[in-house]
Amino acid sequence: MGLPPIECPFDIPKPFRHPDLFDKFSNCDPLPIFFLNRWNESFKVFYQNLDDEHRGLFDVVFDVDAKRGDAGAVSKAASAFKGHFTTEEAEMKKGVDAGKLDGAHYKGHCTAHNKFLELFGSFGNNLGDDEINYSMKWLVNHIKSTDFHYKGKLIQ
């Protein structure tokens, strides 16, 4: 399956570009992340509810991998992503309304969420290595770049 490149909705400022995930030619294409096996402190956005949800997203992707072909695991992952995106977007909207977060970033962030949900849904129940690796790379890239942009800018 030809998967699309992992896209960013805006230029990522250098402080948010994680050197282990990006090569010198791109802001958005992560290097292979097979060395990552779980959420760790380097993924903290410093909002407890969002950090907890991010941990859970790692868990559901690994669960899909462990239970290949299990429709329940895929459905649980899709629900976890959708639920997290709903929570995160609501928190971000408050930041936009308070003037702490840029509206263009918010819109781009929501677009990235929607594109991922659409793509994940298109995978069906039998995710192979490519789809699972893509999902994990997308998650890592999204947290380390796109989500890091809102640190300190949300109203809870």
Swiss-Prot record:
* The keyword Iron appears for this protein: yes
Q: What keywords were assigned to this record?
A: Iron, Metal-binding, Oxygen transport, Transport
**Which GO molecular function annotations are given, in alphabetical order?**
iron ion binding; oxygen carrier activity
Residues annotated as binding Fe cation 2: E88, H109, H113, H142, D147
Where Fe cation 1 binds, per the record, is at: H54, H84, E88, D147
What InterPro entries does the annotation carry? Haemerythrin, Hemerythrin, Hemerythrin-like, Hemerythrin-like_sf
Q: Does the keyword Endoplasmic reticulum apply?
A: no
Q: Which domain of life is it from?
A: Eukaryota
Q: What does this protein do?
A: Oxygen-binding protein. The oxygen-binding site contains two iron atoms.
- Family affiliation: Belongs to the hemerythrin family.
Q: Provide the protein name.
A: Hemerythrin-like protein
Q: Which organism is it from?
A: Nematostella vectensis (Starlet sea anemone)
